[in-house]
Swiss-Prot record:
Described function: The RecF protein is involved in DNA metabolism; it is required for DNA replication and normal SOS inducibility. RecF binds preferentially to single-stranded, linear DNA. It also seems to bind ATP.
Superkingdom of origin organism: Bacteria
A Gene Ontology term for the protein's cellular component: cytoplasm
The protein's name: DNA replication and repair protein RecF
Species assigned in the record: Azotobacter vinelandii (strain DJ / ATCC BAA-1303)
Amino acid sequence: MSLGRVTVTAVRNLHPVTLNPSPRINILYGPNGSGKTSLLEAIHLLGLARSFRSQRLSPVIQHEQPACTVFGQVLWNDGRVRNLGVARNRLGELQIRIDGQNVRSAAQLAESLPLQLINPDSFRLLEGAPKVRRQFLDWGVFHVEQRFLPAWHRLQTALRQRNSWLRHGRIDPVSQAAWDRELCLASEEIDSYRRSYIQVLKPVFESVLHELVELDGLTLSYYRGWDRERSLGEVLAASLPRDQQLGHTQAGPQRADLRLRLAAHNAADLLSRGQQKLVVCALKIAQGHLVDRARRECIYLVDDLPSELDEQHRRALCRLLEELHCQVFITCVDLEALREGWRTDTPVALFHVEQGRITQTHDRE
């Protein structure tokens, strides 16, 4: 799967552009501030209907423009073609179109265009709050288990009902019991999908990590969000007074986490910044392998790689990306830092970016 064509209008400083990228490696090079990251942001907007640089979309829309738009043509390996379009205006209104039809759910975009982002903020996967790691985990489960999303929606509905009751106490005992039962059923289902996914992810992650860096003793484990020796129903009953005091549900899948440990310590506390970056890269590439096993592929957006890794590790990462046989968009300031990182038979397209203008220069010599 790859983006065969992408058209970007009014995204930050980018001039209107239509690109026909390589189905494999695409290198965007040019000075800092030229718009390289903005193109990655536009592709991210196309796949997830949101930016990875700003929680608000208004900064993404070009100055004095009413809206930004991104269109893309997704080419599947079996010959299918899917046309995607996303538009955001300054009022925050979102329009999503798939094959000419308006759709309401960004999940349909994510399903059509699986994206993995590796950028300087990727450290947050190790250092950040559990929510960041849950999002990483659920991205993977979503793309390999079709039953996950309906269960997740059921969980969110049940949680909202229970938390509302905890804050206001306006629910009869029969309804309360029914929502608790629904919460437990959805939670157990989600936990089973997550556990199954982690069991498959761990050996792939360990293998990929070994290709990047030697970190003996690094372990990846999954915490489901409540005591593994007790049912969620038991935990909810025991924690009810505290939940009422706080006004929200403390235990459940919404408290799940991935834990990376090294020598019995939080790995983020012991690893250097470079080692953390390599661990995150290994996690995200491992996820790509699992998506590939599900007979799909994801597209990698890699921002400013040369400034994050030395030449040895940069070449190792490029080799791992090549082995996935997926499409990659990767940015750099100095083209020479990435030009020679690929096999001679790998299609590589080069795009020069300067002052918001993107020009395809030539393929690798």
